[in-house]
């Protein structure tokens, strides 16, 4: 029998317990500090706690920051603040429109605003009174606002009122965060699926369909000089009637189409070329940005640019020459052997936004849309 009795306590385990209790106390104090340091009204971190402060809606023209916005839902919820031009459209599944894209929940129901991961704001629908027509200024944390316009800067009012509100841009400009052109060319996946051009169906020479007739505009002045040397059939208000549903049938009778833009801005190449001319198999005669700008999206022999001629009279002479020389005229269609034109749709544009939001969680602020969109 051991005369010394029970062994004495081992003190090292008490020191370990004290160390663990101290670390636990430090952790509790740290997280309590973070909790009370948050803004009770918005849930947004106060300045100084994070390197980046997410935008809460108040304009800040001097800030452009990055952070990580974690979607609040497994499927992204995208709110259309208004339907484009107040006209509802069908919204198919994005996975069916864009290969490899997961579906987003896209809706125009404004009641989901507090839960939306992103809000798309169509400029035309809010531009006359941005202060009253924009979404609520205090947004949910991490929610991204997307500025969307297919109109040119000449027809976008009050851009300066939007400084600091938006996180992404979406437009026909190729340097937009979300590029949504009016049209594009893509390669045929197999043999071209269209019949050869039937020249015998091209019974007329030059057409122009115009709805926004401004006598002092550059395009109307050029037309007036051109028609002094060449017959041009003009359709639209105060001109030849063009009943709804007959546009392509009518324009397809013409060899050339005046794809004259209503204003001149970088990348502003609209349905006047992609739909009115190319879908009608008419050679587009373009007035808009520079030839080099057009050639970023089209082969150089797919169109005729007014800048290639010293005067409208010279252009008229050239079109008359092509009218008589079938081989030269048909050379403007060679690109169709390998490429086909495609046109935009609202649904496809919204699915491009869906894809962008899935691919990039970076949170930024657009300092000035007015300074960029020129």
Swiss-Prot record:
Report which superkingdom the organism of origin falls in.
Answer: Eukaryota
Q: Which organism's genome codes for this protein?
A: Pongo pygmaeus (Bornean orangutan)
**E.C. numbers:** 2.4.1.152, 2.4.1.65
Q: What is this protein called?
A: 4-galactosyl-N-acetylglucosaminide 3-alpha-L-fucosyltransferase FUT5
Per UniProt, what is the membrane topology?
Single-pass type II membrane protein
Q: Which residues are glycosylated?
A: 60, 105, 167, 198
Transmembrane recorded as keyword: yes
Gene it is expressed from: FUT5
Q: What class of enzyme is it?
A: transferase
The GO molecular function terms of this record are:
3-galactosyl-N-acetylglucosaminide 4-alpha-L-fucosyltransferase activity; 4-galactosyl-N-acetylglucosaminide 3-alpha-L-fucosyltransferase activity
* Pathway recorded for this protein: Protein modification; protein glycosylation
């Amino acid at each position: 029998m051991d005369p010394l009795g029970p062994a004495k306590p081992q003190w090292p385990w008490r020191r370990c317990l004290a160390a663990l209790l101290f670390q636990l106390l430090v952790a509790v104090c740290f997280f309590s500090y973070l909790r009370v340091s948050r803004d009770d009204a918005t849930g947004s971190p106060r300045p100084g706690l994070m390197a980046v402060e997410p935008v809460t809606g108040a304009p800040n023209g001097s800030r452009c920051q990055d952070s990580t916005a974690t979607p609040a839902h497994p499927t992204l919820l995208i709110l259309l603040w208004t339907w484009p031009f107040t006209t509802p459209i069908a919204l198919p599944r994005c996975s069916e429109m864009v290969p490899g894209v997961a579906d987003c929940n896209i809706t125009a129901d404004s009641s989901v605003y507090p839960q939306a991961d992103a809000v798309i704001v169509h400029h035309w629908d809010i531009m006359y009174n941005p202060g009253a027509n924009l979404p609520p200024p205090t947004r949910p944390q991490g929610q991204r606002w997307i500025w969307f316009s297919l109109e040119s800067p000449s027809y976008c009012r009050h851009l300066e009122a939007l400084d600091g509100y938006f996180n992404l841009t979406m437009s026909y400009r190729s340097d937009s965060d979300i590029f949504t052109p009016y049209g594009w060319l893509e390669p045929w996946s197999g043999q071209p699926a269209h019949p050869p051009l039937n020249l015998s169906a091209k019974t007329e020479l030059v057409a122009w369909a115009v709805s926004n007739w401004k006598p002092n505009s550059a395009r109307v002045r050029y037309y007036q000089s051109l028609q002094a040397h060449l017959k041009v059939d003009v359709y639209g208000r105060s001109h030849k009637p063009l009943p709804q549903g007959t546009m392509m049938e009518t324009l397809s009778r013409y060899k050339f189409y005046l794809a004259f833009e209503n204003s001149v801005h970088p990348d502003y190449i609209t349905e006047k070329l992609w739909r009115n001319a190319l879908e009608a198999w008419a050679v587009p005669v373009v007035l808009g940005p520079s030839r080099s700008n057009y050639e970023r999206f089209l082969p150089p022999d797919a169109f005729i640019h007014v800048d290639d001629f010293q005067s409208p009279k010279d252009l008229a002479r050239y079109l008359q020459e092509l009218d008589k020389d079938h081989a030269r005229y048909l050379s403007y269609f060679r690109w169709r052997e390998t490429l086909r034109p495609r046109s935009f749709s609202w649904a496809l544009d919204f699915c491009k936004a869906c894809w962008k939001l899935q691919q990039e969680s970076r949170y930024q602020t657009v300092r000035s849309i007015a300074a960029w969109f020129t």
